[in-house]
């Protein structure tokens, strides 16, 4: 493409992004001092979790950012707690480029560890909470993180795997004590002063499914712009300062992606450590969530509840149920929308490329189970074994290009 063509394409994309972000309420009129704080945070931190919570703390200090089984946290509380945790990590010898493994379920500790890493420029490594001892050992040996943040329930597994790392407990029951430092103690008494941005932003390493052996690590840097988020919001009607129930695991690429979207929207994020179908409906209804983020098997388990239970909870506020992580059966999409309205979105993607296509409720009604179409900024091509494009209606290998693509594998089989 010629230089004038490239310029025209860039201008068009940025104009579309601006329009979408304004429509979603991410860009909105605000007090001059808060506008300045937002601009400074974006310039200093870039589009990172550290920037998002710094901005949200400035714009919505007293609004609730996280709801979990431990209670609620406002955006200002999250900002101060993650500052304290980042300082504690630094005091423990963790710095820019160092790895911090995170083995946590869905709760504030997972989020606080990720944001603290972002503030330091450290790299977050997400460990599957269903790992066996051999998988855990192999991944930790290969990735060589400097520290580990974990839930107390995994202490025995870590001890069996002989994990020799600086360890921090993110979630514990009152009667449990492994002797490791608790994050809750650090954030309650630590240094809450703002940190200086690192020279290079940290990365997130999300593990693949590991169907052929030890899960591979897929390194993912933060996107360089808001274009991918705007492209997603073009298809899924979410707006700023709404409430999202994230049932999908945060360590999974889909759960993490939607949390990233949520903090860009300054959403209130509702979490439950372990998935329970009825509890998910209850929390979604109780908090009047406008979005419920799931993987398809969660929809299946919800729909297996008896009719009386399904009718007990009012999901009238929900306008988007984004599902991803595996194939969505056609019968499942039809039954869900027949019960709860046309609010189901099916996203096809992978750990390596994030989302490739998005199916709207209209798409799913027309062709149940469809993967939909590529969002703006994503290119999907099918090629045969010789590297030639296949004709429409033919089968081929899928290639995806977008700003969310990963940088490469860290190893594994």
Please place each PLM-identified region on the residue numbering:
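Conserved AMP-binding/adenylate-forming core of the ANL superfamily
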Residues: 41, 45, 54, 62-107, ...
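Conserved AMP-binding A3 loop
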Residues: 74-76, 203-227
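Conserved structural elements of the adenylate-forming
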Residues: 79-84, 217-239, 300-304
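A short helix-loop-beta submotif of the ANL/AMP-binding
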Residues: 99, 105-125, 129-133, 142-147, ...
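ANL superfamily adenylate-forming
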Residues: 153-205, 214, 226, 306-308
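Gly/Ser/Thr-rich phosphate-binding loop
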Residues: 206, 264, 290-293, 307-366, ...
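Conserved AMP-binding/adenylation subdomain of ANL enzymes
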Residues: 226-243, 251-291, 305
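Conserved ATP/PPi-binding loop(s) of AMP-dependent carboxylate-activating enzymes
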Residues: 374-377, 388-413
């Amino acid at each position: 493409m010629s230089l004038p063509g490239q310029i025209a394409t860039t201008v068009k994309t940025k104009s579309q992004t601006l329009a979408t972000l304004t429509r979603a309420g991410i860009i909105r009129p605000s007090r001059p001092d808060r506008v300045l704080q937002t601009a400074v945070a974006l310039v200093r931190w870039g589009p990172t979790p550290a920037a998002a919570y710094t901005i949200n703390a400035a714009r919505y200090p007293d609004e609730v950012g996280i709801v979990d089984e431990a209670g609620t946290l406002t955006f200002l509380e999250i900002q101060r707690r993650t500052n304290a945790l980042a300082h504690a990590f630094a005091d423990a010898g963790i710095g820019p480029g160092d790895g911090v493994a995170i083995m946590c379920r869905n709760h504030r500790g997972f989020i606080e560890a990720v944001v603290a890493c972002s503030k330091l420029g450290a790299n977050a490594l997400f460990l599957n909470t269903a790992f066996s001892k051999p998988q855990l050992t192999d991944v930790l040996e290969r990735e060589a993180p400097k520290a580990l943040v974990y839930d107390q329930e995994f202490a025995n597994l870590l001890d069996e795997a002989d994990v020799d790392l600086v360890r921090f407990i993110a979630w514990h029951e009152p009667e449990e004590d492994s002797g490791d430092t608790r994050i809750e103690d650090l954030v309650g008494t630590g240094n809450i002063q703002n940190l200086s941005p690192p020279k290079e932003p940290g990365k997130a390493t999300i593990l693949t499914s590991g169907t052929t052996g030890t899960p591979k690590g897929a390194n993912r840097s933060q996107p360089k712009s808001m274009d991918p988020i705007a492209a997603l919001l073009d298809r899924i009607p979410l707006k700023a300062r709404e409430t999202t129930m994230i049932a999908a695991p945060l360590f999974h690429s889909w759960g993490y992606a939607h949390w990233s979207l949520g903090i860009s929207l300054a959403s209130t994020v509702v979490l439950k450590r372990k998935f329970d179908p009825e509890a998910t409906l209850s929390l979604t209804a109780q908090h009047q969530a406008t979005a419920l983020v799931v993987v398809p098997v969660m929809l299946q388990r919800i729909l297996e509840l008896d009719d009386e239970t399904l009718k007990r909870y009012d999901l009238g506020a929900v306008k988007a149920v984004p599902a991803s992580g595996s194939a969505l059966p056609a019968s499942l999409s039809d039954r869900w929308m027949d019960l709860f309205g046309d609010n189901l979105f099916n996203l096809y993607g992978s750990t390596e490329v994030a989302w490739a296509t998005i199916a709207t409720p209209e798409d799913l009604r027309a062709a149940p189970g469809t993967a939909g179409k590529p969002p703006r900024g994503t290119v999907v091509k099918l090629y045969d074994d010789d590297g030639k494009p296949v004709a429409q209606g033919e089968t081929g290998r899928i290639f995806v290009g977008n700003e969310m693509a990963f940088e490469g594998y860290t190893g594994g089989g």
